[in-house]
Amino acid sequence: MSGGVRVEKSGPVTTVIMNRPEARNAVNGPAAAGLYAAFDEFDKDDSAAVAVLWGDNGTFCAGADLKAIGTPDSNPVHRTGPGPMGPSRMVLSKPVIAAVSGYAVAGGLELAIWCDMRVVEEDAVMGVFCRRWGVPLIDGGTVRLPRLVGHSRAMDMILTGRGVDSAEAYAMGLANRVVPKGEARQRAEELAAELAALPQQCMRSDRLSTLHQWGLPEADAMDFELSLIHI
C-alpha cells in the first residue's frame, strides 16, 4: 500500500497500519486513498475474517492533515464516493477493531468510531479537537458518536472539543477494552483472532442486522434480521 498506509496479515487477521509519523498519522488525500484501498481489499479477501486499524509510532491518528489543504494532497470532500478520511463511508461485511494508542482525535476519532470495537491504551486520549480550529466533523462523527455513547455525552464531546481519557471512554462505552500502554495492537489482534475463530456467517449476519436497524421501525428491523437467516 502507499500514502503512509501498510498492511500486515497473520492468518485470518489483517492489520491496516497508519504510518505518517511526521504528521502524527494525520490523514491526507493519498493516505485516505490508501486506507480505502486497504479495507476494500480486506473485504474482498475470502481468507481475511477480521481487521485491525492501528496507528504506528505511538499515535492512532491526529485527524485530517490540515497542512495538505489547498495542495494536490488535500483530502477529497464529496457527497458521494469515499469519505474524506478514506473508509468512513464503507459498510464492510466483516468486523474491524480499532487499536488506539496516543491520540485519536478529530477525524482520527471518526475513524475509531467507524470501527466495530475499540481497544484503547490506558494513556490514550479521544476527542473532537477539530472544534478548536473551526473544522467540522464530516466523516460520521455527528452520526456514530451519539449512537455509541448517547446524545448527551456526544454533545458534551462535540460542543466542547475536550479530551476524554481511557477511563471515561470506557465508562461511556466509547472504549470496549482498556489495556496497558504499548499493548493496543497486540490485544486488538488477539481479540480479532478470537472473533475469527467463531462461526462467521452467523456473526456477520448479526453484525449487519445491528448496523442496519438504526432508523427502522422495530417490526421492519426484526423482519430484516430474520431475512438474513437461511431457513
Each model region followed by its residue ranges:
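Conserved small/polar residues in nucleotide/adenosyl-binding loops
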Residues: H230-I231
